[in-house]
Amino acid sequence: MFYRYPINDVHIHLFDPKDIDECIAMVDECGYTNWTFLACTVIDSPFALAQNLLCALMKLKEGGRCQAFGSFHYNGDVVPDADDLLRQIQWFDQAGFDGIKMLDGKPGVRRRQNLRLDAPNYDKMFDYAQRTQFPI
């Protein structure tokens, strides 16, 4: 009974582009029919800036099997202002991403950013997401 159906509730973080083929091979071997790539731009890594590009690439390579959830860009740990976050979420939506992996609510990230999730910085972005039903 437990292994009769394929596992579909899975997300993957991929940090180095050289691991793309290995990631796809793992997805195939595990029998995932759908999976989600969650970009992570707040990592302390030279690959942080390329996370959203890698996320979009995996969505294209996987031909509909991979959902792409982008990640907001920050200036260090400073949360962008409301207009910048609005521009970012609109771009993700228009570029074909399936949603946002909003890392701001994770305890460690939130501690570094020192900003509550109900701060005005997020208002326009949350309004857009709610109005368009763009997943966060």
Each language-model region and where it sits:
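An N-terminally biased module of ancient metal coordination in phosphate/nucleic-acid-related enzymes
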Residues: M1-R65
